């Protein structure tokens, strides 16, 4: 593989330390790097920059991305030297900082927004106080849910307990039946890999109607005031349960870990998912870019 190294468990501490120096892009978080490892993921480092070869969430093939600052150009040049018969290098999910460091480089053929992969960022205070215009209508829907189902409750559940894992998998499978989802296997396998990761710091909140588990969210607090909202499913016979889950989770993450922002991941170009995430009223998005590089103009 030349310059590339397989991402192994012992690499995750180093990769997480590097990612912590940058904005919290979900695809470069160690949970994503490990859980969505459909085949092997790869990386190499030059100076302050790491270049990755990762599995695409939806397409299933490998793509190249990076995270870095001043050493982005030499890292790309090193990447190009490892490739044969390549006139153009295409990078996906390039973070804003890296894009700014190369956008005036003569080797750049094109730069465009990677719209299917922008991260949705939410202000936690607005989520739990319903203070934005979009959020105010959500409060009414949640009240209706709780009035109709007064025995709904939530609790933090232990992901190392096999009984809890079985309940989570059952909710996911029920969601497949309710939605008719076809492309669910990658997410399901990623869910199972993430849950089994040792020392992952994942927080799972289970939602119950009396004793019956009807939903869950799986999240991870980060040191920069964010938390990553990785996985979540709900029984769709409970109208607005997913909204309630986000509200309860945001409140818990703020009270317990002091989180100020939630990263609700990209929409992967799925229209229904895009509509849902926009309906929640994101405060901003962490933008990502597709960058094409002319190898002949590298210097």
Identify the meaning behind each predicted range.
Residues 3-33:
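Short Lys/Arg-enriched alpha/beta "domain-start" segment
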Residues 23, 27-97, 208-236:
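Conserved donor-binding loop and adjoining core beta-sheet/short helix segment
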Residues 88-104, 116-119:
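Short, glycine/charge-rich beta-strand/loop segments that flank catalytic centers
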Residues 90-92, 155, 260-264:
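Short catalytic-loop micro-motif centered on adjacent basic/acidic residues
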Residues 99-110, 276-277:
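Short, aromatic/basic amphipathic alpha-helical patches
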Residues 107-181:
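Acyltransferase donor/substrate-recognition loop-hinge adjacent to the catalytic core
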Residues 160-212:
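Short, conserved active-site entrance elements at the starts or edges of catalytic domains
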Residues 201-295:
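Aromatic (often tryptophan-rich) hydrophobic motifs at membrane interfaces
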């Amino acid at each position: 593989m030349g310059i590339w190294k397989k991402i192994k468990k012992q690499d995750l501490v180093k990769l997480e330390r590097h990612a912590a120096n940058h904005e919290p892009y979900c695809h470069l978080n160690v949970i994503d790097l490990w859980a969505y490892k459909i085949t092997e993921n790869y990386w190499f480092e030059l100076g302050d920059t790491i270049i990755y070869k990762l599995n695409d969430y939806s397409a299933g093939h490998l793509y190249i991305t990076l995270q870095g600052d001043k050493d982005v150009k030499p890292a790309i040049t090193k990447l190009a030297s490892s490739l044969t018969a390549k006139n153009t290098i295409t990078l996906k999910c390039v973070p804003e900082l890296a894009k700014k460091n190369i956008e005036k480089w003569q080797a750049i053929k094109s730069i465009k927004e990677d719209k299917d992969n922008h991260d949705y960022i939410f202000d936690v205070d607005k989520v739990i106080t319903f203070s934005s215009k979009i959020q105010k209508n959500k409060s009414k829907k949640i009240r209706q849910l709780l009035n109709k189902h007064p025995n709904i409750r939530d609790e933090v559940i232990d992901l190392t307990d096999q009984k809890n894992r079985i309940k989570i998998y059952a909710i996911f499978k029920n969601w497949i039946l309710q939605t008719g989802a076809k492309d669910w296997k990658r997410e399901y396998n990623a869910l199972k890999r993430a849950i089994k990761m040792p020392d992952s710091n994942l927080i799972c909140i289970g939602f119950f109607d009396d004793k019956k588990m009807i939903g869950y969210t799986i999240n991870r607090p980060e040191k920069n005031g964010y938390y990553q909202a990785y996985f979540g499913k709900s029984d769709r016979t409970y109208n607005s349960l997913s909204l309630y889950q986000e509200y309860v989770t945001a409140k818990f993450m703020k009270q317990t870990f002091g989180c100020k922002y939630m990263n609700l991941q990209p929409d992967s170009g799925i229209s229904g998912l895009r509509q849902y995430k926009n309906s929640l009223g994101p405060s901003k998005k962490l933008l990502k870019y597709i960058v094409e590089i002319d190898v002949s103009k590298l210097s």
